[in-house]
């Protein structure tokens, strides 16, 4: 299976590493008996998803499939802190383990410090004591296969072909870039038997969380909970995904004029920009950037009338609920990473001249924004919003 790493240097390095691993593991593959995965009955399963929050959410349908296939197994999920907050009380998962992998493009938490290495070694030791029977890695990351599969002693290891990995795995699905991440995650599990599509991503909210977020909105606005509430999600972990702030301001103004209460969502790092975006606006326009936990944000979008934003985790969280979504795409491939919801309208142009598989930077920026996003006008977003009023759902 071909490696699907689109950075040429990384791809070349991976080919060399995979070739070396293939040689070293050849005797193991020859001498080892191939397990019958369709008859597997593991006592402990480790699900591995150390990506960003949108990736974890898009994998959640696979959680349902694993629980259905292995109802008596203890299922552990290894994810980051935000993933733990979202899925810590998930009935499909017995225990959530946390490790915040340092992703290089993030402004914070992007270095392997001595403390991070120490945490990693302690985690590997903990997992060795767990005696994991089955590791399921949904990212297809060679580093994760080695660290959390080989070094932890996981007896059976399955993943996809994104980074090769075949010599270290007992089963590997094809990483197909023409398919959505939800579908690819489910294909990883096909080695255990045919997979029924369990539907959309899902986040389980408690009975207390909905009334609590409604109360928070009422305290913010000083009024009863609004009948028309729009959530704006203008911020992403990568600047190349950003849509011009002035465009968002135009959309917010139009929503406000149409009687919507508008709330801008984001992290603490976005709070200053959010206040600047809404400053001087008339109507009921507010910011909760940096003022909500990820679970509060999930509750917030679940009670909204619509969510409008760029390619960000907020939209994937919104896809877990029956809320209309307007998703603004440009530098990333919507076929793979769009919000997986029948309520989602995807807006994008065909003007992207960069490598959408890398989506690291734009080589043709317009006023500091990616060209493909700068050419997508507010009028197109407002048209999609108007369509929502006529028909909130676009597909079953």
What label would you give each PLM region?
Residues 1-396:
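Catalytic machinery of carbohydrate-active enzymes
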């Amino acid at each position: 299976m071909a490696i699907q790493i689109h950075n040429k240097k990384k791809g070349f390095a991976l080919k060399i590493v995979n070739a070396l691993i293939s040689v070293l593991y050849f005797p193991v593959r020859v001498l080892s008996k191939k397990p019958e995965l369709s008859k597997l009955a593991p006592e402990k399963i480790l699900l591995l998803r150390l990506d960003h929050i949108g990736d974890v959410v898009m994998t959640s349908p696979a959680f349902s499939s694993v629980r259905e296939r292995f109802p008596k197994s203890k299922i552990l999920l290894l994810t980051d802190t935000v993933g733990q907050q979202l899925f810590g009380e998930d009935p499909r998962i017995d225990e959530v383990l946390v490790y915040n992998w340092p992703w290089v493009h993030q402004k914070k938490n992007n270095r392997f410090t001595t403390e991070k290495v120490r945490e990693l070694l302690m985690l590997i030791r903990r997992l060795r004591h767990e005696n994991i029977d089955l590791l399921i890695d949904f990212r297809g990351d060679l580093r994760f296969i080695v660290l959390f599969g080989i070094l932890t002693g996981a007896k059976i290891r399955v993943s996809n072909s994104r980074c090769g990995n075949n010599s270290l795995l007992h089963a590997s699905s094809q990483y197909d870039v023409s398919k959505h991440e939800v579908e690819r995650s489910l294909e990883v599990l096909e080695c255990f038997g045919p997979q029924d599509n369990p539907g959309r991503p899902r986040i389980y909210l408690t009975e207390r969380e909905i009334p609590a977020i409604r109360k928070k909105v009422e305290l913010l606005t000083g009024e009863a909970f609004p009948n028309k509430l729009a959530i704006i999600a203008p911020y992403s972990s990568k600047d190349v995904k950003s849509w011009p702030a002035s465009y968002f301001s135009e959309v917010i103004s139009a929503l406000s004029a149409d009687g919507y209460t508008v709330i801008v969502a984001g992290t603490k790092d976005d709070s200053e920009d959010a206040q600047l975006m809404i400053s001087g606006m008339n109507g009921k326009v507010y910011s909760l950037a940096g003022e909500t936990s990820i679970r509060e944000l999930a509750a917030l979008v679940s009670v909204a009338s619509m969510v409008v934003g760029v390619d960000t985790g907020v939209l994937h969280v919104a896809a877990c609920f029956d809320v209309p979504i307007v998703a603004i795409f440009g530098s990333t491939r919507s076929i793979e990473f769009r919000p997986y919801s029948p309520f989602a309208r995807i807006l994008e142009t065909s003007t992207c001249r960069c490598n959408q598989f890398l989506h690291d930077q734009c080589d043709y920026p317009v006023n500091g924004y990616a060209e493909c996003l700068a050419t997508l006008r507010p009028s197109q977003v407002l048209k999609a919003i108007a369509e929502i009023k006529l028909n909130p759902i676009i597909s079953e």
